[in-house]
UniProtKB/Swiss-Prot annotation:
One of its GO terms (molecular function) is pyridoxal 5'-phosphate synthase (glutamine hydrolysing) activity. This is Pyridoxal 5'-phosphate synthase subunit PdxT. The active site is at C79, H170, E172. Belongs to the glutaminase PdxT/SNO family. The keyword Flavoprotein does not apply. Pfam families: SNO. SUPFAM superfamilies: Class I glutamine amidotransferase-like. In the presence of PdxS, forms a dodecamer of heterodimers. Only shows activity in the heterodimer. L-glutamine binds at G47, E48, S49, R105, I134, R135.
Length: 188
């Protein structure tokens, strides 16, 4: 059975754990670098990316997560996770640099501009995925190595590169497990 960790420093940790378990994998909370040992994949949940980055640095998690990815292990970042995994963050904040694109934080606006949208994901077929965007980022300037999986208003909101999958929205806040299934079946 696949073992998936969820970075448990802030954000929708419990919701991701429930989604992982409902997809048939084992879920573990990751708070320290040693918690990465033995995992097949890692989820960086939504939350507040600046706060998450500061905590990751304080607990010395940045380099171990980069090393985890360099071993070919899969990482799935949602919302703030997308921001943290991007090569660059607009404004120059430090990131993990694992997907070759630039993240625009709060790209669709602040909390009051949160919204839902139907996304037609080729890999999923019908029906459309009901995506929940909360202070959502998006990606710009992807390299040729990045596969764009979904856009809203011509903005990249889901993408993958090698073993890295990112969404600007929160699949863990829905009852639709197709993103986690995709991660487990195609990436891990």
């Amino acid at each position: 059975m696949k073992k998936i960790g969820v970075l448990a420093i802030q954000g929708a940790v419990d919701e991701h754990i429930q989604m992982i378990e409902s997809a048939g994998a084992l879920a573990f909370k990751v708070k320290h670098s040693s918690d990465l040992d033995g995992l097949d994949g890692l989820v960086l949940p939504g939350g507040e990316s600046t706060t998450m980055r500061k905590i990751m640095k304080r607990y010395d998690l940045m380099e171990p997560i980069r090393a985890f990815a360099s071993e070919g292990k899969a990482i799935f970042g949602t919302c703030a996770g997308l921001v943290l995994l991007s090569k660059e963050i607009e404004g120059g904040e430090e990131s993990l640099g694992l997907i070759e694109a630039t993240a625009i934080r709060n790209g669709f606006g602040r909390q009051k501009e949160s919204f839902e949208a139907e996304l037609n994901i080729e890999a999923f077929g019908e029906p459309a995925f009901e995506a929940i965007f909360i202070r959502a980022p998006y990606l710009i300037e992807p390299s040729n190595e990045v596969a764009v999986l979904a856009t809203v208003e011509n903005r990249i909101v889901a993408a993958k590169q090698a073993n890295i999958l990112v969404t600007a929205f929160h699949p863990e806040l829905t009852n639709d497990n197709r993103w986690m299934n995709y991660f487990l079946e195609k990436m891990v």
